[in-house]
Amino acid sequence: MKAMILAAGKGTRVRPLTYELPKPMIPILGKPVMAYLVEHLQRHGVSEIMVNVSYLHEKIEEYFGEGHQYGVQIGYSFEGYTNNQGEVVPEPLGSAGGIKKIQEFGGFFDETVVVLCGDALIDLDLKSALYEHRRKGAMATVITREVPWEKTSSYGVVVSDADGRVREFQEKPARADAKSNCASTGIYLFEPEVIDLIPSGEVFDIGSQLFPLLAQRGLPFYCQTRKFNWIDIGSVKDYWEVLQGVLTGGIGNMTVPGVQVEEGVWVGLNTRIDWNGTRIVGPVYIGSGCQIEAGATIIGPTWIGHGSHVCSGARVVRSVLFEYTRVLPDVTLDELIVFKDYSVDRAGEMRHVSQAECGGWSNARDRRGVRRPAEDVVK
């Protein structure tokens, strides 16, 4: 079995994180989401992986290279062009269109392929899913999970018969129109014949175009409703909840890194905490090279990225700070994700640092205006 990771989208619903990162590169426990996918594929015997890329493609390619460090081979298919000014312009072909481009270029898909979205954490038993796919004689299989009816408008919904054969596929139907609450997880098993149905050179989507085509033609298209961990990072709220879940131990197979120095408090290498008047209530992770000044307060679940600096009197409450964030004296950050010059609350409302009370935070690498010890001053 080969694999295809879909990684060409812009991830607009996860801004500001995706202003500088493609969605598959958003970190969980300091590691990109896509890295967990690659490791999962390798554990299930998949050694050849193609990735379609477009928006900020170089971030993915530079991090993963050709995949040797993961014990796999990774190839890339760029979707876009360079304009007359020499600028790279992303131009995604849609989830199915990207697969077609790869097939026409080099014929990569010559056996069963598992297709996955690059922005979800999963622990699906791929070997079991493949066995069932082949047992049914399926041309295409979509892995589904039941979701609350009120959330069907956020997913592609699969309508199937008692044998699991897909009769209809609804792309994000309104609650009143949904005929099922079995949601597509963005994990698919395809035989090469499926790719023959995708038109050449067109933007073509799996959920809204390919799946309805398979169902309408009565082809052997099945769903498998399985119980497994599926964490879809579709929005900033999802991301916030994932990190909260990791820190509270609510997500299986994921442990907090670092060394536990107090009950529920983990720290990375070479981090300095002045405990004089400082209050830290776990679960809290403080990354490597951080500084926590005397009199600071940190209430978990909180994740503080490496190289960050929490000043005296500052309060960080149930928040996520990306690397090199300086929380200024006497400032409170409550239930926020802070990424460089932006913060986002749980509801997804974004604010620039210029809108924050008392300045809020700054770049911990910028020492301008920061009082330095006398021995650091050059005379």
Residue ranges and their predicted role:
Residues 112-114, 121, 127-134, 147-150, ...:
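Catalytic-core segments of class I nucleotidyltransferases/pyrophosphorylases
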Residues 50-54, 143-144, 337:
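Short internal beta-strands
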Residues 61, 69-161, 199:
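Conserved beta-loop-beta/alpha segment of the NTase-like Rossmann-fold superfamily
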Residues 351-379:
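Structural signal for terminal/edge beta-strands and the immediately following C-terminal loop/tail
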Residues 1-62:
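N-terminal glycine-rich phosphate-binding loop and ensuing alpha1 helix
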Residues 259, 265, 271-278, 284, ...:
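A structural motif detector for beta-strand N-caps
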Residues 216-301:
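Extended, small-residue-rich solenoid/repeat segments and analogous flexible loops
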